[in-house]
């Protein structure tokens, strides 16, 4: 049975074969797989955000901190903070700051960089009245400029959940949510031309509502994100050839994390957000084995209210090129914000 241990009190944002990029409040740096720092510390933003980000509770409550990190093709680094995205050079200098997008930040898998170096940025905002146009942004110059590559008109969808590169098909996948008539806002799109055009692959029902997808040679896998509605949370497989989906099993709570690894393994995590379809107050880590997900670890929600932080386990970006499981626990008993690593 797989086991995990605490590595460092921080958030894991991006994983590489030889290091893990982590964030503590409004600063980021890289550590090796023993938790030793192997890069300079880079501070982000002004003194107010840095002060609020020093303490985990204030950082989680006010959504202050760093949320995404992407190493770019030219060795610069893109990071997202609340309502602002920065690009840093190798010396830790800010070379660009961008804030034209809507929302505090993208979804957890709402940014990606392709092997050719194109950066995609998917807008995520609450948008309860569906009165905002929603945009997918693209940069072809290493994050120095961003331009809208696709727009969903107000009333069409609520927001974008993820955009992710698929090494198997050499394409991009994008997911939207959350409700709509007959689940019309829940969609899966595919682009084979660097985001110029998007083919609608599937739509309707909560089974198309995902926060991200995992890739295998013959399928896409995801858990549904039906946290605040009564629908049962499902684990779904989509065949690459037929594009048909199959419900493999039920989950105990909404799927908040998923990650594929270079050795062929795939992991999924469920969270605690207070939805009526949750079976209990535990967040679970699951491994995909022989066509099903098996529970390998679980933690109970901590004492702090859900408005401060859901109880979740989240994977860093970049796992597809790595073989060792790394993730961050947040809002869980004894694991308020820890980077965990496979023993």
Task: Place the predicted regions along the sequence by residue.
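Repeated scaffold domains used in trafficking and secretory/extracellular systems
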Residues: 5-17, 49-54, 58-72, 103-114, ...
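Entry beta-strands of beta-propeller and related beta-repeat scaffolds
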Residues: 20, 75-78, 117-121, 169-174, ...
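Conserved Ser/Thr-centered positions that define the repeating blades of beta-propeller domains
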Residues: 31-32, 88, 139-140, 191-192, ...
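A short beta-strand motif characteristic of beta-propeller blades
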Residues: 39-41, 51-59, 94-101, 147-153, ...
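Short, solvent-exposed loop/turn segments at conserved positions within beta-propeller repeat blades
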Residues: 79-80, 127-133, 156, 177-185, ...
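Asp-box/WD-like beta-propeller blade repeats and closely related beta-sheet repeat scaffolds
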Residues: 88-114, 121-126, 148-153
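Loop/turn-rich, solvent-exposed surfaces of beta-rich toroidal or solenoidal domains
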Residues: 216-233, 248-304
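Blade-level signature of beta-propeller repeat domains, shared across WD40, Kelch, NHL, RCC1
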Residues: 310-343
């Amino acid at each position: 049975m797989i086991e995990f241990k605490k590595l460092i009190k921080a958030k894991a944002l991006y994983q590489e074969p030889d290091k893990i990029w982590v964030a503590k409040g409004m600063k980021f740096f890289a550590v090796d797989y023993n938790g030793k720092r192997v890069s300079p510390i880079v501070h982000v933003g002004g003194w107010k955000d840095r002060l609020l980000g020093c303490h985990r509770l204030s950082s989680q409550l006010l959504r202050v901190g760093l949320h995404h990190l992407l190493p770019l093709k030219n060795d610069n680094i893109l990071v997202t903070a609340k309502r602002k995205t920065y690009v840093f050079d190798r010396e830790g200098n800010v070379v660009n700051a961008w804030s034209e997008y809507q929302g505090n930040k993208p979804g957890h898998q709402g940014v990606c960089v392709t092997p050719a170096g194109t950066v995609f940025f998917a807008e995520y905002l609450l948008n309860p009245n569906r009165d905002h146009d929603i945009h997918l942004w693209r940069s072809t110059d290493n994050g120095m400029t961003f331009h809208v590559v696709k727009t969903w008109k107000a009333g069409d969808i609520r927001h974008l959940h993820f955009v992710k590169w698929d090494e198997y098909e050499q394409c991009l996948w994008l997911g939207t949510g959350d409700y709509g008539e007959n689940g019309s806002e829940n969609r899966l799109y595919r682009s084979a031309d660097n985001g110029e055009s998007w083919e609608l692959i599937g739509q309707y029902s909560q089974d198309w509502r995902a926060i991200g997808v995992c890739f295998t040679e013959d399928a896409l896998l995801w858990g549904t994100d039906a946290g605040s509605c009564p629908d049962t949370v499902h684990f779904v497989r989509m065949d690459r050839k037929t594009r048909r989906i199959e419900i493999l099993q039920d989950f105990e709570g909404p799927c908040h994390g998923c990650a594929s690894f270079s050795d062929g393994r795939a992991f999924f995590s469920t969270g605690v957000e207070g939805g009526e379809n949750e079976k209990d107050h535990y967040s679970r880590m699951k491994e995909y084995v022989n066509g099903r997900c098996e529970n390998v670890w679980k933690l109970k929600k901590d004492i702090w209210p859900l408005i401060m932080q859901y109880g979740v386990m989240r994977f860093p970006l970049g796992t597809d090129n790595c073989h060792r499981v790394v993730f961050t626990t947040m809002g869980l008993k004894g694991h308020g914000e820890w980077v965990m690593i496979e023993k």
